[in-house]
């Protein structure tokens, strides 16, 4: 194999296949790039293997497993991050197997590497009282306060990922017979999520205040920071932290997403609808919320048939039985 084959395959995978054919998001692409950047770093620093000498066969199971161990032990990555890196590598080898069947054996060996079991993280979410407290904190009479309130309401009302919020354009908001927002999620898959009347009113007011109703503004980003630039994830997280309910040190956009899902579930919304609102591909992902809600489990048990335990009688002493038991002792 020529020394340029690996570089050629990796370039085609990252620059053409993932963004153009698969249509992955920028965040997914960045994650895949990080996986291979770290792998090349490991090869050079730990194995003394220059990038120009790396081939498909060079990336043996032993080398990949060494890389994964290096991530956990030296780089202090979590088991979850380790598994994400492995997933990116496996996806590349599936691509390589399809592009060049000559390397099917080398690819299959990598695909057999198992993921590492990791503890199930505690699902953090806010109660209805806490989300109410949070939404009451911004001052809607100021420009920043109004914008911040809109951000909080959109994240909670739609259950959107932070990347979906940041990608929203004016044209993604629809006010017809019922208000709704079009979100673009993982794999560039779009979905429409209904908006509550109060969030819709906030949006109408915001669009009017910002002069965003003209046709030429439809492709403009909906929410910008004070400098008129795109928000970053860190910027949105900072806003959430500023209005965090009492007793919560760290609030992230994903906690609001979890909160919306749990509140829908607790309100009796069918889990299939919750899956569609959140944009999950696999309903098993949505079922995580059902497993996490201990209060719902308790109520379900209370509503079920009671365990038919018979009434316990009163123990009556039997002198003959006691005498017989004593006779068994030496």
Provide a role label for each language-model segment:
Residues 1-330:
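Conserved catalytic core of the tyrosine transesterase superfamily
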